[in-house]
Design a protein with these regions (language model features):
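N-terminal glycine-rich FAD/FM-binding segment characteristic of electron-transfer flavoproteins
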Residues: 1-260
Length: 260
């Protein structure tokens, strides 16, 4: 099987968020970066499928030069090779622009399966995976908690897979799909492995193919404003006799706090 995993570099959760002067994104020039956590689970699932069915795992990431940090990390964890879609404008690309850039790099590989994380930790729109499937012209399924692959017994692409989707209210859904396909992986689907010293050293010798991105396309989605929520705290003193105070408290909880 040839499995492609799309990964994204995001700021670390410990980094102190600062909004830029235009209030359209964060001021990330001095940020610390890490692999998007849902993508780490997608990578782990791909590595497990490779161990079971054979083949190779290719990681693809779109963004400026700094994304090679997470590409190297993915290679150290066990991916075989990588593709870097290089473009400074991709750092703040919307889902459509990002998916188009990824699709252009993935199509020539003709993969059996493409995995992405369910969503990114920084924006959380959960759109890139489904738009990517449309750009590649293959079926997709989202919020995946289990993957069972039945590869083709012949040469070339084919086969099918059975996936478990997480629904609302504790419900799950099993779906059977033909390959090739795109899946968006839910966090917690597996237990993550971490890079060993041998893996880190071996990653230095693995191929990272640099693919220049197409000229920047017009964004179809634009963030108009971003802000840090302010904390609002109000204290109200209820006076009167105990009976009067209790009656007033119940009224406040019902009408203002809507807690009862």
């Amino acid at each position: 099987m040839k499995i492609v995993v799309c990964i994204k570099q995001v700021v670390t959760r410990e980094w102190q968020v600062r909004v830029n002067d235009a209030k359209t994104w964060v001021r990330d020039q001095d940020a610390s970066w890490e692999l998007n956590e849902p993508d780490a689970y997608a990578l782990e699932e791909a590595l497990r499928l490779k161990e079971k069915h054979g083949g190779e795992v290719i990681v693809v990431s779109a963004g400026p030069a700094r994304v090679t940090q997470v590409i190297r990390e993915a290679l150290a964890r066990g991916a075989d090779r990588a593709i870097h879609v290089d473009g400074e404008h991709l750092a703040q690309a919307d889902a459509f622009v990002a998916a188009e850039a990824l699709a252009a790099a993935i199509k020539p590989e003709n993969p059996d399966l493409v995995l992405t994380g369910l969503q990114s930790d920084d924006q959380g729109f959960a759109q890139v995976g489904v738009v990517l499937a449309e750009k590649l012209g293959v079926a997709h399924s989202t919020i995946i908690m289990d993957v069972q692959v039945n590869p083709s017994t012949g040469s070339g692409q084919g086969g099918d897979l059975k996936v478990k989707r997480e629904l609302e209210g504790g419900w799950f859904q099993w779906v059977t799909m033909a390959l090739p396909a795109v899946l968006t992986i839910q966090s917690g689907i597996n237990t993550l492995r971490y890079a060993t010293l041998k893996g880190i050293m071996g990653a230095k010798k693995k191929e990272i193919r640099n693919v220049p991105s197409a000229p920047p396309a017009a964004l179809r989605q634009r963030i108009t404003s971003i802000y840090v929520p302010s904390k609002a705290k109000q204290t109200k003193l209820v006076q009167g006799t105990p009976a009067e105070a209790a009656k007033e408290l119940v009224k406040l909880l019902r009408d203002e706090a809507r807690a009862i």
